[in-house]
Amino acid sequence: MQKNFEEYPKYLFHEGTNIEADKLFCPKKAVIDGKKGWIFRVWAPNARDVSLVGDFNGWEVGATPMKKDDGGIWEVFVEGLKVYDAYKYAVTSKKGKTVLKADPYGLHFETTPQTASKLYDLSGYKWKDAAWLKSREEKNIYESPMNIYEVHLGSWKRHDDGNVYSYVDLADELVEYVKKMNYTHVEFMPVTEYPFDGSWGYQVTGLFAPTSRYGTPHDFMYLVDKFHKAGIGVILDWVIAHFPKDEHGLSLFDGTPCYEYSDPRKGEHYEWGTKVYDYGKPEVRSFLISAANFWATNYHIDGIRVDAVASMLYLDYCRKDGEWLPNKFGGNYNLEAKEFLQKMNVALLSAHKGFFTVAEESTAYPMITMPPDIGGLGFNFKWNMGWMNDTLSYIETDPFFRKEVHNKLTFALTYAYSENYILPLSHDEVVHGKHSLIDKIPVSYEDKFEGLKTYLGFMMTHPGKKLLFMGGEFGQFIEWRFDQGLDWLLLAYPRHKGMLEYTKDLNAFYKSTPALWSQDNRWEGFRWVSVDDNTQNVISYLRYDKSGDYVLVVLNFSPVPRKRYLMGVPELTSYKCVFSSTMKKYGGNSSYKAEYKAEKKSMHGLPFAIAVNIPGNSITIYKPENN
């Protein structure tokens, strides 16, 4: 059965270097000896028997037996099948137990609570994003704006009857909204197939399939295509740190630990109730890297954000003494996971120019975004969880007491250039009793809005790329709920409408101001002006682009206005306000753009100064007249 053609891909699969294992294992149409049918393959090296069951044979175990090769790959050719036929593999262990397993390489699935795989033909979609892909190849992502809107597709909006939006619905509405709001990228919380709604997609059973909750694979292609035509990049939340124990999934696939580590001290996340991939097993490496490569190739995805990287890197992650195995050197690093991540990043970034990878890594593990050839993991970006935790703690503090925690606002600059960072205000920060972004701010109703505007302004002008979870842009008050849409009705209220308008304009200002993104990864792009005025809750800094043009950013995290506040500046010229959170259109109390003439008075280590009036709870951005 096409043996000569398949032998080399099988060799690479068993070697751990086949990054297109989908071409070997995903069911596909074929013509053999003049007969039309579908080829199925599945890796189950320790199974006693495997047969294909489905609609076509009444789900009768053994009716369509598969043949095993020397490497543990079972295969069969079946005539008379059609797209959308449901199927599973009936895998019989050496102990004689038969379990019906979904296809690890399945392209489409039944909608939960059903769990069967479904035949699908990915061919036929006519992409219209060639211009986007070409521009992506030519872009330097480190010196370009990156402002990400994080979305859970099932709860961004819902129909009046409570039903979810389809991929096609989202292509009609979400794309237009993200473009109107001036974001550069959208990040989908996991869309790879998963059985349990309450996992938010983080317990994956189908790494090669967009969830059928919202439509077909072609529908998902259409959604990505629409984003690209609108000039928006698409990032997937990518879950390869663990997988669920659902019987139809990967757990004990052939009756033995096949995809997971055999020792539960490495192979189980007790706290999450899930299994851990065996990153040292060649076939598992081929499977995982092929999955990411598959989405980049077939769905034109622009990047992946790898979830829970810390849990992959540390053998003692969320484990007590005696519950974990040290590595060969006696340490707590998972050396196999490190090597796997390095190989994954090299493979993906080599195969897809302009594609990028992001690590959600919550510790101080070194060199996450450094090249593998010097010992790094090879990611393009890392989430800056330290910045997020510190600054959220700061805004949760009453303004009167913020002087005691002023360092939480400024500390991130001591390490801001040690990695290529993304500043994340993600879904994790607006659930489980943590409150929504706006409700974290412990002041009056009116001041909550001004405080959130100030905080978002701080994020957008701080070194690092940006990410904001849906709802934060208009000040959603209640926590995120995965089974309901956002509270769009709030936009009927002026303060929420003003908040949305503010975020839209702030995003536009960021995107049009190279000083705020062209030197995110080097010290030359930043200079503190006022860093330690904790008594007045004021900070200020300069952001520079590569040509030397700059903006002066002034932030007041107190509700008390500051009059004639002396601010050091580099030039003896006029400084004009080019952006302010207190404009009336945003619900503030002023709409003018003030201008200040510099004086020959040194301040903050700079040769000149301006005496500015700083509104309470505000961000104000100035440009020198000669810019």
Feature map (PLM): residue ranges:
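Substrate-binding/active-site clefts of carbohydrate-active enzymes
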Residues: E110, A130-E143, H152-N332, V612
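C-terminal beta-strand-rich structural cap/linker in extracellular carbohydrate-active enzymes
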Residues: V83-Y87, Y592-N627
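Conserved, mostly hydrophobic/aromatic
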Residues: V42, Y89, V151, V178, ...
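The feature marks proteins involved in alpha-glucan
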Residues: M1-I39, K67-E150, S155-G162, D169, ...
